[in-house]
């Protein structure tokens, strides 16, 4: 006899860094959200972007007149917001194309600024704090080496996450 085990994913996090692979991961997350939403009501889909402050070209430090590097950081925030808006647009389009009259996906955007270059940890910590049921992440991000099977961020998330992780290549 085989037992069927159904998993309820009511809160799904997708890590988005603007790379082609992260947008592909968004499509997978949206598809899962639609399927689970059809089975069990609405699903919250969280698009999360982590800005690694150590990767800014200019140093970011406090001065008497404000923060040096603030302009570059603001540009990164705008770029991150554009990525999240693109993912949200995909979710809305998919939700509208669904045959049901029910809006199954509630999309939420989050941007985290990471001061210590621990992007994987920032994703895992956020997922745990928000009680996420599933994390969807691309194999490699914008800076990943082509020959690596799994990037360092994805590897950290897979290793330390409290919940299931779907890695998309």
Placement of each model-derived feature along the sequence:
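Structural beta-alpha unit
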Residues: 1-3, 7, 89-135
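Gly/Ser-rich helix-loop-strand patches that form or flank binding pockets
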Residues: 1-4, 8, 126-169
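Small/aliphatic-rich secondary-structure junction motif
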Residues: 4-69, 98-100
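Active-site-adjacent beta-strand anchor residues
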Residues: 15-16, 112, 138
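Short, solvent-exposed amphipathic alpha-helices that sit
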Residues: 28, 78-90, 122
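General small-molecule cofactor/ligand-binding pocket signal
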Residues: 46-48, 108-112, 166
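A short acidic, glycine-rich active-site loop
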Residues: 66-82
